[in-house]
Protein backbone atom coordinates (compact mmCIF):
# COMPACT_ATOMS: atom_id res chain seq x y z
CA UNK A 1 0.00 0.00 0.00
CA UNK A 2 1.18 3.51 -0.80
CA UNK A 3 2.20 5.83 2.04
CA UNK A 4 2.57 3.00 4.54
CA UNK A 5 5.51 2.91 6.95
CA UNK A 6 6.98 -0.12 8.70
CA UNK A 7 10.01 0.45 10.93
CA UNK A 8 11.91 -1.43 13.61
CA UNK A 9 14.42 0.27 15.91
CA UNK A 10 16.78 -1.57 18.26
CA UNK A 11 17.65 0.27 21.45
CA UNK A 12 21.25 -0.39 22.59
CA UNK A 13 20.66 0.87 26.14
CA UNK A 14 17.37 -0.83 27.01
CA UNK A 15 17.95 -3.86 24.75
CA UNK A 16 14.40 -3.80 23.43
CA UNK A 17 12.80 -3.47 19.99
CA UNK A 18 10.50 -0.62 18.99
CA UNK A 19 8.11 -1.27 16.09
CA UNK A 20 6.05 1.31 14.24
CA UNK A 21 3.41 0.65 11.61
CA UNK A 22 1.72 3.61 9.89
CA UNK A 23 -1.07 3.44 7.32
CA UNK A 24 -1.16 -0.35 7.04
CA UNK A 25 -4.19 -2.50 6.20
CA UNK A 26 -2.64 -5.86 7.03
CA UNK A 27 -4.50 -8.62 8.82
CA UNK A 28 -2.33 -10.52 11.32
CA UNK A 29 -3.36 -14.19 11.69
CA UNK A 30 -3.33 -16.14 14.94
CA UNK A 31 0.27 -16.37 16.19
CA UNK A 32 2.42 -15.85 19.28
CA UNK A 33 5.79 -14.40 20.28
CA UNK A 34 8.53 -15.50 22.67
CA UNK A 35 8.65 -12.05 24.26
CA UNK A 36 6.40 -9.45 25.89
CA UNK A 37 4.66 -6.94 23.64
CA UNK A 38 3.51 -3.56 25.01
CA UNK A 39 1.81 -1.48 22.34
CA UNK A 40 -0.89 1.04 21.54
CA UNK A 41 -3.12 2.19 18.70
CA UNK A 42 -2.43 5.70 17.37
CA UNK A 43 -5.02 5.68 14.60
CA UNK A 44 -7.65 3.29 13.29
CA UNK A 45 -9.85 0.66 14.82
CA UNK A 46 -9.13 -3.06 15.06
CA UNK A 47 -10.76 -6.31 16.02
CA UNK A 48 -8.41 -8.19 18.36
CA UNK A 49 -8.65 -11.79 19.56
CA UNK A 50 -6.29 -12.86 22.34
CA UNK A 51 -6.42 -15.99 24.48
CA UNK A 52 -10.09 -16.68 23.66
CA UNK A 53 -11.08 -13.07 24.44
CA UNK A 54 -12.36 -10.61 21.81
CA UNK A 55 -11.92 -6.83 21.81
CA UNK A 56 -12.53 -3.76 19.68
CA UNK A 57 -9.45 -1.57 20.10
CA UNK A 58 -9.18 2.16 19.39
CA UNK A 59 -6.63 4.99 19.61
CA UNK A 60 -5.26 5.35 23.13
CA UNK A 61 -5.83 1.72 24.08
CA UNK A 62 -2.78 -0.02 25.58
CA UNK A 63 -2.11 -3.65 24.59
CA UNK A 64 -0.27 -6.23 26.70
CA UNK A 65 0.80 -9.63 25.37
CA UNK A 66 2.72 -12.17 27.42
CA UNK A 67 5.16 -14.58 25.78
CA UNK A 68 3.22 -17.33 23.97
CA UNK A 69 -0.14 -15.51 24.17
CA UNK A 70 -1.92 -16.44 20.93
CA UNK A 71 -3.47 -13.41 19.24
CA UNK A 72 -4.75 -12.10 15.92
CA UNK A 73 -6.12 -8.79 14.66
CA UNK A 74 -7.64 -7.15 11.60
CA UNK A 75 -8.88 -3.75 10.53
CA UNK A 76 -12.52 -2.65 10.81
CA UNK A 77 -14.40 -0.77 8.06
CA UNK A 78 -11.31 -0.48 5.87
CA UNK A 79 -9.52 1.86 8.26
CA UNK A 80 -5.73 1.87 8.14
CA UNK A 81 -3.70 1.23 11.27
CA UNK A 82 -1.10 3.41 12.99
CA UNK A 83 0.51 1.39 15.77
CA UNK A 84 3.58 1.50 18.02
CA UNK A 85 4.93 -1.17 20.34
CA UNK A 86 7.99 -2.29 22.24
CA UNK A 87 9.10 -5.92 22.45
CA UNK A 88 10.76 -7.00 25.70
CA UNK A 89 12.58 -10.33 25.90
CA UNK A 90 11.95 -12.35 29.10
CA UNK A 91 15.53 -11.96 30.35
CA UNK A 92 15.32 -8.16 30.01
CA UNK A 93 11.93 -8.16 31.74
CA UNK A 94 13.32 -10.31 34.54
CA UNK A 95 16.20 -7.89 35.17
CA UNK A 96 13.83 -4.91 35.19
CA UNK A 97 11.39 -6.62 37.54
CA UNK A 98 14.20 -7.46 39.94
CA UNK A 99 15.24 -3.80 40.02
CA UNK A 100 11.65 -2.68 40.63
CA UNK A 101 10.39 -5.31 43.08
CA UNK A 102 13.47 -7.16 44.29
CA UNK A 103 11.95 -10.37 42.95
CA UNK A 104 13.05 -12.26 39.87
CA UNK A 105 9.56 -13.55 39.01
CA UNK A 106 8.32 -12.82 35.52
CA UNK A 107 5.00 -10.94 35.43
CA UNK A 108 1.85 -12.31 33.85
CA UNK A 109 -0.53 -9.70 32.46
CA UNK A 110 -4.05 -11.09 32.65
CA UNK A 111 -5.58 -7.93 31.11
CA UNK A 112 -4.65 -7.73 27.45
CA UNK A 113 -6.28 -4.35 26.74
CA UNK A 114 -6.23 -1.26 28.97
CA UNK A 115 -8.80 1.00 27.35
CA UNK A 116 -7.92 4.70 26.87
CA UNK A 117 -5.16 4.37 29.44
CA UNK A 118 -3.01 7.22 30.77
CA UNK A 119 0.14 5.08 30.44
CA UNK A 120 -0.25 5.23 26.66
CA UNK A 121 1.29 8.72 26.73
CA UNK A 122 4.35 7.39 28.57
CA UNK A 123 4.75 4.56 26.08
CA UNK A 124 4.41 6.99 23.18
CA UNK A 125 7.11 9.27 24.60
CA UNK A 126 9.39 6.28 25.24
CA UNK A 127 8.88 5.01 21.69
CA UNK A 128 9.69 8.43 20.19
CA UNK A 129 12.88 8.73 22.26
CA UNK A 130 13.98 5.27 21.09
CA UNK A 131 13.26 6.21 17.48
CA UNK A 132 15.16 9.49 17.74
CA UNK A 133 18.03 7.91 19.72
CA UNK A 134 17.94 10.76 22.23
CA UNK A 135 17.91 11.40 25.99
CA UNK A 136 19.18 8.05 27.29
CA UNK A 137 18.50 8.98 30.93
CA UNK A 138 14.90 10.08 30.29
CA UNK A 139 14.36 6.98 28.19
CA UNK A 140 15.50 4.61 30.95
CA UNK A 141 13.39 6.45 33.52
CA UNK A 142 10.30 6.12 31.33
CA UNK A 143 10.93 2.43 30.69
CA UNK A 144 11.22 1.57 34.39
CA UNK A 145 8.25 3.80 35.28
CA UNK A 146 6.10 2.12 32.63
CA UNK A 147 7.03 -1.38 33.80
CA UNK A 148 6.56 -0.45 37.46
CA UNK A 149 3.01 0.78 36.86
CA UNK A 150 2.10 -2.25 34.74
CA UNK A 151 3.63 -4.76 37.15
CA UNK A 152 2.16 -3.23 40.30
CA UNK A 153 -1.34 -2.74 38.94
CA UNK A 154 -1.87 -5.21 36.08
CA UNK A 155 0.34 -8.26 36.62
CA UNK A 156 -1.03 -11.25 38.48
CA UNK A 157 1.46 -13.77 39.85
CA UNK A 158 -1.31 -15.96 41.25
CA UNK A 159 -2.91 -16.14 37.81
CA UNK A 160 -0.08 -18.36 36.58
CA UNK A 161 -1.09 -21.18 38.89
CA UNK A 162 -4.71 -21.02 37.68
CA UNK A 163 -3.92 -21.24 33.97
CA UNK A 164 -5.06 -24.71 32.82
CA UNK A 165 -2.11 -26.89 31.91
CA UNK A 166 -2.35 -28.52 28.49
CA UNK A 167 -2.72 -32.28 28.46
CA UNK A 168 0.36 -34.48 28.29
CA UNK A 169 -0.50 -35.31 24.68
CA UNK A 170 -0.65 -31.65 23.66
CA UNK A 171 2.64 -31.00 25.48
CA UNK A 172 4.18 -33.87 23.52
CA UNK A 173 2.96 -32.36 20.25
CA UNK A 174 4.38 -28.92 21.16
CA UNK A 175 7.76 -30.41 22.07
CA UNK A 176 7.80 -32.49 18.88
CA UNK A 177 7.00 -29.48 16.69
CA UNK A 178 9.63 -27.35 18.41
CA UNK A 179 12.25 -30.03 17.72
CA UNK A 180 11.15 -31.00 14.20
CA UNK A 181 9.87 -27.67 12.81
CA UNK A 182 12.25 -27.87 9.83
CA UNK A 183 10.85 -31.24 8.74
CA UNK A 184 7.75 -32.13 6.72
CA UNK A 185 5.62 -33.08 9.73
CA UNK A 186 2.21 -34.63 9.02
CA UNK A 187 -0.93 -34.94 11.09
CA UNK A 188 -0.40 -38.68 10.92
CA UNK A 189 2.99 -38.24 12.65
CA UNK A 190 1.31 -36.37 15.49
CA UNK A 191 -1.53 -38.88 15.66
CA UNK A 192 0.92 -41.76 16.06
CA UNK A 193 2.86 -39.77 18.67
CA UNK A 194 -0.19 -39.22 20.88
CA UNK A 195 -2.33 -42.23 20.09
CA UNK A 196 -5.21 -39.89 19.26
CA UNK A 197 -7.19 -39.85 16.05
CA UNK A 198 -6.31 -37.03 13.66
CA UNK A 199 -9.65 -35.31 14.26
CA UNK A 200 -9.42 -35.55 18.06
CA UNK A 201 -5.82 -34.32 17.98
CA UNK A 202 -6.62 -31.32 15.79
CA UNK A 203 -9.67 -30.39 17.85
CA UNK A 204 -8.00 -30.84 21.26
CA UNK A 205 -4.77 -29.05 20.33
CA UNK A 206 -6.61 -26.06 18.88
CA UNK A 207 -8.90 -25.83 21.90
CA UNK A 208 -6.07 -26.03 24.44
CA UNK A 209 -3.48 -23.87 22.65
CA UNK A 210 -5.78 -21.46 20.79
CA UNK A 211 -3.95 -22.21 17.54
CA UNK A 212 -3.81 -25.14 15.11
CA UNK A 213 -0.77 -27.48 15.03
CA UNK A 214 0.21 -26.14 11.62
CA UNK A 215 -0.02 -22.50 12.73
CA UNK A 216 1.96 -23.39 15.85
CA UNK A 217 4.72 -24.92 13.71
CA UNK A 218 4.72 -21.97 11.29
CA UNK A 219 5.15 -19.60 14.24
CA UNK A 220 8.08 -21.65 15.55
CA UNK A 221 9.62 -21.52 12.06
CA UNK A 222 9.24 -17.74 11.87
CA UNK A 223 10.75 -17.25 15.33
CA UNK A 224 13.72 -19.42 14.35
CA UNK A 225 14.08 -17.58 11.03
CA UNK A 226 14.22 -14.27 12.93
CA UNK A 227 17.13 -15.56 15.00
CA UNK A 228 19.00 -16.62 11.87
CA UNK A 229 18.38 -13.30 10.13
CA UNK A 230 19.61 -11.45 13.21
CA UNK A 231 22.89 -13.37 12.84
CA UNK A 232 23.25 -12.28 9.20
CA UNK A 233 22.03 -15.50 7.56
CA UNK A 234 20.63 -14.77 4.09
CA UNK A 235 16.83 -15.09 3.74
CA UNK A 236 17.15 -17.91 1.19
CA UNK A 237 19.34 -19.90 3.60
CA UNK A 238 17.11 -19.08 6.57
CA UNK A 239 14.12 -20.38 4.61
CA UNK A 240 15.89 -23.67 3.87
CA UNK A 241 17.10 -24.12 7.45
CA UNK A 242 13.67 -23.54 8.96
CA UNK A 243 11.69 -25.88 6.72
CA UNK A 244 10.05 -23.50 4.25
CA UNK A 245 9.76 -24.79 0.70
CA UNK A 246 11.42 -21.65 -0.69
CA UNK A 247 12.21 -18.01 0.12
CA UNK A 248 8.90 -16.66 -1.21
CA UNK A 249 6.99 -19.07 1.04
CA UNK A 250 8.92 -17.84 4.08
CA UNK A 251 8.48 -14.20 3.04
CA UNK A 252 4.71 -14.64 2.86
CA UNK A 253 4.43 -16.05 6.38
CA UNK A 254 7.14 -13.77 7.80
CA UNK A 255 5.38 -10.58 6.70
CA UNK A 256 2.02 -11.90 7.91
CA UNK A 257 3.37 -12.39 11.43
CA UNK A 258 6.16 -9.82 11.80
CA UNK A 259 4.86 -7.05 9.53
CA UNK A 260 8.23 -6.76 7.75
CA UNK A 261 9.85 -8.80 4.98
CA UNK A 262 12.84 -10.99 5.92
CA UNK A 263 15.15 -8.65 3.98
CA UNK A 264 13.85 -5.59 5.82
CA UNK A 265 14.28 -7.38 9.14
CA UNK A 266 17.82 -8.56 8.33
CA UNK A 267 18.95 -5.09 7.19
CA UNK A 268 17.99 -3.57 10.54
CA UNK A 269 20.28 -5.98 12.36
CA UNK A 270 23.03 -5.54 9.77
CA UNK A 271 22.99 -1.81 10.56
CA UNK A 272 23.30 -2.54 14.29
CA UNK A 273 26.21 -4.94 13.74
CA UNK A 274 28.16 -2.27 11.85
CA UNK A 275 27.70 0.47 14.44
Swiss-Prot record:
Which residue spans adopt a coiled-coil conformation according to this UniProt entry? none
Q: Which residue ranges carry the DNA-binding annotation?
A: 188-209, 235-258
Q: Mind telling me which SMART domains this protein's record contains?
A: HTH_ARAC
Xref: SUPFAM superfamilies: Homeodomain-like (SSF46689), Regulatory protein AraC (SSF51215)
Q: Which Pfam families match?
A: AraC_binding (PF02311), HTH_18 (PF12833)
The transmembrane segments are none
Entry GO MF terms: cis-regulatory region sequence-specific DNA binding; DNA-binding transcription factor activity
Does tRNA processing appear among the keywords? no
Q: Which GO terms describe its biological process?
A: regulation of DNA-templated transcription
Which ranges carry the HTH araC/xylS-type domain?
171-268
- Which keywords belong to this entry? DNA-binding, Repeat, Transcription, Transcription regulation
Question: What protein name applies here?
Answer: Uncharacterized HTH-type transcriptional regulator YbfI
Whose protein is this, by species?
Bacillus subtilis (strain 168)
The primary gene name is ybfI
